[in-house]
A protein has these predicted regions:
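PAPS-dependent sulfotransferase catalytic core
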Residues: 1-92, 116-117, 122-125, 129-131, 223-284, ...
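PAPS-dependent sulfotransferase catalytic domain
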Residues: 70-105, 112-226, 359-362, 373, ...
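Noncatalytic modules at the cell exterior or secretory-pathway interfaces
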Residues: 82-83, 382-400
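Glycan-recognition and processing domains
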Residues: 282-325, 335-342, 353-365, 399-415
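Extended extracellular/luminal ectodomain segments enriched in beta-structured repeat modules
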Residues: 322-331, 388-391
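Short proline/glycine- and polar residue-rich coil/turn motifs
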Residues: 366-376, 384-386
């Protein structure tokens, strides 16, 4: 249960009918009568997705509204002019869009999404907040993470409580019938049901495959070129007049517990979204004759990251974004390129870092010749955290090697 401190629903008669429709199945290619709606959940690669999807439509068919709260104030005839909508919105907010809709969204590991969202708001300069009247962001900017995640301020900071679930269910406070949700389980069930009927779902951690899958589901060209826009870690360098440096939020046990509670429903949504994504990708590959049906595709926690000569790659531990102090043993699984393509002077470097690569905790070099080119070999790396650390990553760097495959599944244990 959400608890007595959170009041669902609104007073009878205070507002007009707020019932809305759940997502209706609309499979198949994008048709001329369809409206493509991109449901932009903050910090899920949504800005990138907008710039990939919008060029498929003439400029006068792209709705200029970016926030769903504004749609109810537009007449149906005006909304009917547009075929592409890219909105920070819940499903209830997009209900006024006329005609059949194909809804697309991206999902991101919930803890990482929440922390990125929090840090994005904290990095906004005060003068920008003043100029753009972003008082809700000012409130969050000056809140410690532990305070932000306490149960009581949900009414003022709903973006930091299971946001994927909220957006996909339709509304935080009311069910499609217009009544209050009975409990958080009903809210989650609605979100999962709507997720099943999405025209396409992308996973933030796998952008290339996500945009490929979306393009194939909608039967449109794939315009993704590797761009990454509005990335929290880079915004200060990209737009220094708008963003400033911020101190990383401390992560103690109580904060980690609150972070876990604030994302527990979203983890269910994210896991189901990854499963749907994997299944759709598998079907697409089978139809192309690329893999037999019994071979699992590589979009799971054990997904491969393949690096070529002089390439680098990061493997986010996820969901181990906030690890307590202590000594750890991480096990990776590596497979080297074909022996005939390997150079004896080649090298593989594995390191463990945290805080957006600011702290290096361990470095290990591996000779490519000790690795099999047919199966994955386990490689252990020990590291110690003197203090609790967030955004812990393992990085692999390759030199003098045709290719290296790294399984994204990392076994981690405290020793």
């Amino acid at each position: 249960m959400l608890g007595a401190k959170i009041r669902f629903g609104r007073a009878p008669g205070l507002l007009p009918d707020f019932s809305y429709s759940p997502v209706l199945p609309n499979p198949g290619p994008l048709r001329p009568e369809d409206r493509l709606v991109f449901l932009h959940v903050e910090k899920t690669a949504g800005t990138t997705a907008h710039h990939v999807l919008a060029p498929h439509f003439p400029e006068d068919q792209v709705c200029p509204v970016r926030f769903g709260l504004h749609l109810p104030f537009w007449e149906n005839a005006r909304l009917a002019r547009y075929r592409f909508f890219s909105l920070h919105a819940s499903l209830r907010m997009i209900d006024p869009i006329p005609g059949p809709k194909k809804i697309v969204t991206f999902l991101r590991e919930p803890v990482e999404r929440l922390l990125s969202h929090y840090n994005f708001w904290r990095s906004l300069r005060e003068e920008v907040i003043d100029e753009e009247h972003l008082d809700h962001i000012r409130y969050v900017k000056h809140l410690a993470l532990k305070e932000l995640l306490s149960p009581t301020p949900l009414a003022t900071t709903p973006d930091f409580w299971n946001l994927h679930t909220q957006r996909l269910a339709g509304d935080l406070f009311m069910a499609p019938s217009g009544r209050a949700w009975r409990d958080e389980h009903e809210l989650l069930d609605a979100a999962l049901a709507n997720l099943e009927n999405m025209a396409a779902v992308g996973i933030t951690e796998y952008p290339e495959l996500s945009f490929q899958r979306i393009a194939e589901d909608l039967d449109i060209p794939n315009r993704y070129d590797g761009m990454r826009l509005n990335v929290t870690a880079n915004i200060r360098e990209d737009e220094p007049h708008r963003f400033e440096r911020f101190e990383e939020a401390p992560m103690d046990d109580e904060t980690a517990e609150r972070l876990d509670r604030a994302t527990r429903l979203d983890r269910r949504v994210y896991d189901r979204g990854k499963s749907l994504f994997r299944d759709r990708l598998r079907v697409g590959l089978v139809l192309k004759g690329m893999v037999p049906p019994h071979v699992p595709t590589a979009i799971e926690d054990g997904c491969e990251l393949v690096l070529g000569h002089h390439q680098e790659g990061n493997i986010l531990f996820g969901p181990y974004c906030a690890l307590p102090a202590g000594s750890y043993l991480a096990t990776l699984w590596l497979r080297a390129g074909a022996a005939s393509n390997r150079k004896r002077e080649g090298s593989i470097t594995i390191d463990v870092c945290s805080g957006g690569s600011q702290k290096i905790h361990a470095v290990q070099s591996i000779r490519p010749l000790i690795l099999s080119d047919q199966w994955f070999d386990p490689v252990d790396i020990h590291f110690t955290l003197a203090d609790p650390a967030s955004l812990v990553e393992i990085r692999a760097t390759v030199a003098g090697l045709a290719n290296l495959a790294v399984k994204r599944g990392v076994a981690l244990r405290l020793i």
